[in-house]
């Protein structure tokens, strides 16, 4: 039997290599997908072979992640429950896509992953595999063996597998779009998140940072007048605004699997870009377009979070989003200081704002007759309803 394992290099998936080999008498091929995590990929490959993999692949998917996935997180203002920029959720379908490519290439009968039975990721991995490689068997060792961390360490030692046991008390998942932090005291939603949990948003600079972001058709193309591709924009902003302490998210999240969980994220570039994009949208769309786009954004975010990337509705929403975003071009001016961001102004290329109409000091004013007629018609629904109800 041939099995392809989505391999992170951590304890769970390292132990899974040997467990899969022995349990299924299988040849295990491992695939690590680089979506921007700060890992030592040489050491990960080395660890995979020592644990028993017959072949290992490291795939650089950072540019792919930015251009095909994060681009839509920006265009669709991807925020689950209006706060979480979907950093972990967004990467999972891409990881599965790359794993499936290898599985099909070598003719693997099964795909394995390290998700547990309590997490959202099992839903995202399983549904993506079913969509892209329905004939493959899905194996999630952590859902089967029910090993604690200590038991996993004991198992690895018994098999002579040198393991990386992180000194950190936190469980970290990291990619280009964000860093999620779980475990230890963070699990208690009544407790303050310790400062040692953070890495990307540790304030190392006290100055007031001003940034201009230029958008073209809904996507950022310049930072402070310097042209760069989307991957570079994200990397630059993560460093610039993260070092000023901006980009932390903490909330009680409604998981796909039926319970609430305290979640903490560091998402500096994501928040700056989404907030700026939303501001430019508001300055450009008609009121009806703006309300419609907000409803699309919410539906898109829910689908991505729930692991339904391959749901046809997601693609339909993106087509509408592309059509609306063709008008989102211009500049947004922001300021970041002491962990806070504020928008200083914006210039939308297609903004219908008219100073002549909006100014109180000059230009157009409706007549008294026009104002009275508008107000009468505008309020008619409410006034007639009150009268019919006797209130």
Curated annotation (Swiss-Prot):
Pathway: Amino-acid biosynthesis; L-arginine biosynthesis; L-arginine from L-ornithine and carbamoyl phosphate: step 2/3. It catalyses: L-citrulline + L-aspartate + ATP = 2-(N(omega)-L-arginino)succinate + AMP + diphosphate + H(+). Keywords: Amino-acid biosynthesis, Arginine biosynthesis, ATP-binding, Cytoplasm, Ligase, Nucleotide-binding. One of its GO terms (cellular component) is cytoplasm. L-aspartate binds at residues 116, 120-121. GO terms for molecular function: argininosuccinate synthase activity; ATP binding. L-citrulline binds at residues 84, 120, 124, 171, 180, 253, 265. Signal peptide: none annotated. ATP binds at residues 6-14, 114. Belongs to the argininosuccinate synthase family. Type 1 subfamily. This is Argininosuccinate synthase. It comes from Sulfolobus acidocaldarius (strain ATCC 33909 / DSM 639 / JCM 8929 / NBRC 15157 / NCIMB 11770).
């Amino acid at each position: 039997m041939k099995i392809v394992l989505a391999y992170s290099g951590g304890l769970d998936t390292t132990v899974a290599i040997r467990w899969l080999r022995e349990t299924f008498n299988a040849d295990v091929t491992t695939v690590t997908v680089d979506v921007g995590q700060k890992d030592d990929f040489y050491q990960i490959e080395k660890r995979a072979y020592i644990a028993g993999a017959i072949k290992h692949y490291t795939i650089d998917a950072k540019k792919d992640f930015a251009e095909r996935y994060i681009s839509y997180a920006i265009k669709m203002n991807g925020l689950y429950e209006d706060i979480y920029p979907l950093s972990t959720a967004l990467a999972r379908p891409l990881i599965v896509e790359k794993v499936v490519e290898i599985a099909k290439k070598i003719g693997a009968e099964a795909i394995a992953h390290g998700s547990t039975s309590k997490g959202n990721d099992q839903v995202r991995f399983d549904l993506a595999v079913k969509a892209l490689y329905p004939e493959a068997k899905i194996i999630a060792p952590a859902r089967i063996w029910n090993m604690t961390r200590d038991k996993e360490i004991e198992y690895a030692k018994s098999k002579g597998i040198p393991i990386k046991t992180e000194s950190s008390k936190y469980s970290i998942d990291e990619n280009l779009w964000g860093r999620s932090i779980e475990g230890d005291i963070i699990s208690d939603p009544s407790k303050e998140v310790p400062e040692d949990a953070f890495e990307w948003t540790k304030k190392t600079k006290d100055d007031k940072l001003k940034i201009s972001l230029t958008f073209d058709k809904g996507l950022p193309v310049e930072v402070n007048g310097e042209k760069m591709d989307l991957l570079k924009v994200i990397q630059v902003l993560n460093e610039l605004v993260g070092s000023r302490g901006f980009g932390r998210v903490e909330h009680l999240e409604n998981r796909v699997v039926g319970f609430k969980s305290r979640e903490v994220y560091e998402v500096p570039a994501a928040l700056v870009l989404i907030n700026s994009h939303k501001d430019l949208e508001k300055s450009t769309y008609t009121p009806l377009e703006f309300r419609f786009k907000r409803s699309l954004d919410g539906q898109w975010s829910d689908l991505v979070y729930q692991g339904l990337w391959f749901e046809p509705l997601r693609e339909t929403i993106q087509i509408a989003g592309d059509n609306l975003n063709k008008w989102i071009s211009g500049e947004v001016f922001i300021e970041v200081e002491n962990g806070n961001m504020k928008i200083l102004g914006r210039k939308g290329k297609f903004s219908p704002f008219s100073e002549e109409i909006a100014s109180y000091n000059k230009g157009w004013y409706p007549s008294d007759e026009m104002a009275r007629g508008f107000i009468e018609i505008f309020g008619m629904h409410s006034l007639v309803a009150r009268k019919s109800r006797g209130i």
